[in-house]
Amino acid sequence: MGFDAVFDPHNWALVPFHFWSLVFFAFGCIVGSFLNVCIYRMPLDLSVVSPPSHCPHCKYSIPFYLNVPLLTWLTLRGKCKNCGAPISPRYFVVELLTGLAFLACWLAFGHTAPWVALVYCLFLAGLITATFIDFEHFIIPDEITFGGAAVGFVISIFLPQLHGTNSLRESVGRSALGIAIGAGIVYAVLRLGKLLFGRQKIKLPDGAKIIFTETALCLPDSVIPYEEIFYRKTDAIVLQARTVELIDRSYCNVALRLTPEMLKLGDEKFNPEHEPHMDVVCSEIILPREAMGLGDVKFMAGIGAFIGWQGAFFSLLASSLIGSAAGIALILLRKREWSSRMPYGPYIALAAVIWIFGGKKLFDLLFQM
């Protein structure tokens, strides 16, 4: 058999369907191994290509025979072969999840639209990467959001079937509308939420003292770690202080504004890292509060490029329900602090997955009632 026969798509069709199912699962696990690299390196602005895979603890360069998806982590019992340091179970989970996602795409669309199945594999790979990065860092890199929007739009030009049509014009229009409506709706929700709920005003007893330490804000009845206050660099604690006591100086009747990168007292500005302790007397303090950020806006634009405006709209509604259910469940499980620290991107990603595997039928059913 010559190379022409090997690469002839008509011969591929003769291969049993479930053989391709195995291929998609295996290929998904391999892709999942690369996604782990992206999840670890992208938030740190490191190259995902160089250097090759290595242990994050001892920097041991991992040879190819120790870089087999799923099997390596299991056989080494989640430890580095060289130094014995533990390797996060996340590596195994991402590889398995990606393999199952690719398999699901093939089983759902392989019979009727194999190219669409391949595109959805790419789409789900992006969702998985964004989800785990958002969980760990509360950011979604622009390479995923803007990159996803660009890739989804370009694919819509060459594969109209992605949007359920054979018309190039309709496909491009649905992708563009998905980008615009996806980003537009989430941005409107973001601005409205910021306007209505973006600040939490806490009244304090007269003469109450609050303490700013290196790691937390200490109120009279609670201690709030800074990581539960500052989700983004622009978040700020604002108050009008009666007195402010620093280690080497004091202030009276001064406006105080604290962000992760700057402490402002009146017109003076300081590096917060140089002020490890601060006693403040005030009657009211305003803390930042925000459910989603611009990363979620860009993320929805990328999603809309692949699944159109209906999918983007469905994803917004479904993610709200999923987020509410998850928050209530965590509170009932006495994990209230987890519910306040859950990023919104994973809910959007899960809603988009639901759309791909049956959400459109649910959408049509709801709007036909």
Predicted regions and their residues:
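A membrane-topology feature that recognizes alpha-helical transmembrane segments
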Residues: 1-369
